[in-house]
Amino acid sequence: MPAARVPTLTSLSVLIALALGAGAAHAAGPEAPPETVVASGTAAASTLDAVVVTGSRTSNRTVKNSSTPIDVISAEDLASTGQANLLEALQRSLPSLSQIGGYQSDQESLIRGYQLRNLSPGYTLVLVNGKRRNASAYVSGANGGGYPGHAWTDLALIPVSAIDHIEVLRDGASALYGSDAITGVINVILKSNAHGGNVSVESGQSIDGDGTRTSVRANIGLPWGQDGFVSLSGENTRQHHAIRTRRYIDAYLSYPAVDASGNPVALRPNNRLPAGTTPNPAEASRDPEANTILSSPSYALTALAVNAGHGLGENAQFYATATASDRTAQAIQNFRLPATIFGTYKAPSVLNVWPDGFLPVLETKEKQYTGTAGVKGHWGGWDIDGSLTGNRNTVRTYTRHSANFSLAYPGAPTDFYDGKLDYQQGIANLDLRRGFDVGAFASPLEVSAGAEYQHERYERGAGQWESYTGFGAAAFVGYSIADAVEATRNSKAVYVGAATNVTSRWYLDAAARWEDHSDFGSVSTGRLTTRFEVTDAFGVRATVSNGFHAPSLGAQYYQATGSCPCGTTLVAQVSSPAALALGATPLQPEKADNYSLGVTWDPSAAFHLALDAYQIDIRGQLGQSSQIGYNAQDPARITDNSGTVLSAAQKNTIDALLGTAGISILPGDAFYASYFTNVGDTRTRGLELTVEANQETAWGKLRWSYAANVGRTTIQKVRDIPAVLQRLPNINLLTKSSEYALRFRTPAYTQVAGLGWQHGRWRSNVDVTYYGPIKRLNNGVEYKQPPVLVTNLSGSAELGGGWSAALGINNVFDKRTRKVPEYARSATDVASIETTWDTGDVLSTIGAFWYGRVNYRF
């Protein structure tokens, strides 16, 4: 295996060396053309000298001279990736931003998370034209999600057709923007064209011939009076399932056995035949590939956007933006075998409707609306910007092609409405900025100040009765009336800042912010960032800041009840009697300290190198408590959730705790309760390198790029177990699996190297991503997935008359989700399926994907 990695590392080293060589050649040549490479190595125009508006309240910072690491990704960069949406395109463009490639549980397979610097998406703030975009109404954690208690902005809902460019700040910025900006900020800048536009059609499919995706995108700019514009954008994407299976082994039975009289009999553990029975005749025609849970989700997305501006006299401008998205998505769930329906759930009537079992499908219908209107201008020497923003996200969930094993069939439903989640956010904001000439400084002292008011509302609505009664809908139990909730909160903030060039080479920027939230109190944050130009080509930059992540309303009021043959599970609202009885305390904001130190080198206009080291300390990370309760289905052997036999005293302790909340566990039943809580402190350290170069040759322009991210997260402290639980065994605020989810979400390192070529009307791009090893845990057993290389190719041509065409293939060598090694598989998996796939892998199950695109620009 090590030998196989040598060529890969060598090839990346060659790309780096060539890029450095190209930069050195331009530095040596006095006649080098004043061109710079794009941030992602595609054929788009240079972005290194573009003025950026993210991460500072000053107005003259660029990617090159920024005091913090920032990336600018153009619309052309995004399109050249050939990805379905903004989230996937950003993942291709930024090694510091990653996404789990494998299948994720329940709604998380449809509302995808991501990691910036190996941390939860809840720590990344998303802006549109500098205004806060809301997080999803969905909260992760209770149904197998990877980020307990966190909600995040769904980047896939932002229409790519409306985007002019993206600015990604890789640093803490809570002192500028408030909650969530711990690991960074993604600022989506919309198109502001008053004329012209474009229409594109893209289609592709996996190398297996499925997973077909078709996207139609359009933009048009219209004038609004003499000095205004209205930019309209829209897109429609339809993605079909790429079917991937978990194949049952030949010896694994799917149907109940039959006795000598032909009556069905429940199978023994691992679906073995009981004594005196024979296999069901239906086994002869069973489908061993019926379980297609590894298939990619399907969805239909329609997204619209408008960005407008109009002058109000000489000194002011009105501006407005709005986006609307509507997505219906479906994710295939685990197949329900007829043997399981009959034996485990004891629901033979379901076989009247599903005699061969069934494959449930989880469906979400999601609507996202955002809108901002404001006025900005210059009055009395001040630049003033006042705005109002409204955001809303609604997720309605359905279980299709399913059953409730507690109901009688035929007659009971097979499709269920599971309930809705709704999150609304209203923001009023006022920003002021002014430059003051101070003789001691090399540039004006830019002073900024502002105030913000925010109102939030969260609702969880119950589903239909059949979706949650008894066992509930198979695959996703609906929200019950007891789980339903409505909650609101308000917050207000004031902030100040000052920035200047102390000398011609030394830039200094300071900011402070105070916020007060109606539910958990006040938080103060600060930030100091600086840059020193050692020479005209070499600079040093550093930042120190603190930040916070406010516990979402969805996390504070989360409650979900589930039932299965193993018992009833309750994720209790943290302020409920059940949670309080088990030691829950109010959720506190997660607080962070950020430190970064970096250098930049620009020996010529055609070369840029940046190296940044960072440390992020987070205190009070959110997590989920242990499940407290016991299984009394065998009264002679009372066990906890781990299977440990409890003493009479331990059982009595649990009974007493739950009894204070009016909960009792009857003989023959099982019950377990948990809740969200602040579990502990983490430290994330990493190193980021970006190299960009541009080279003129006789046979065209070459654009080189290389980026790498190395990161590591460690657990610094685990909070104490509540006193009321300390006499119980196996109570942990941070289990081993939870620790792995926190520490090893991403590979140990990621490298991305790209080469773009342009000659006349022809363009081509190749980029390779080298994912380092990643630690994994399955069935309590540690293992490691080895490094892997993914290659992407694309080419395009200008056809004349505004027409262009492109072809590409992503994942050329068809790398797919890898297997869990045999020694880490559970006995149940070994006895039932041929292969256990690593659903936490960076690789997806889809494999190679080709696409073609036609674009018309007018």
Predicted feature residues:
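C-terminal beta-signal and adjacent terminal beta-strands/loops
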Residues: 136-137, 618-619, 712-715, 769-776, ...
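Outer-membrane beta-barrel signature, preferentially recognizing the C-terminal barrel domain
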Residues: 482-491, 537, 547-618, 667, ...
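Gram-negative outer-membrane beta-barrel transporters
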Residues: 31, 614-778, 857
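N-terminal periplasmic accessory domains that precede
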Residues: 86-89, 93, 114-115, 127, ...
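Outer-membrane beta-barrel transmembrane domain signature of Gram-negative proteins
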Residues: 350-352, 358-371, 390, 402-507, ...
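Extracytoplasmic beta-strand/coil segments of soluble accessory domains associated
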Residues: 59-60, 91-137
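N-terminal periplasmic "start-of-domain" segments of outer-membrane beta-barrel proteins
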Residues: 47-81, 108, 137-148, 197
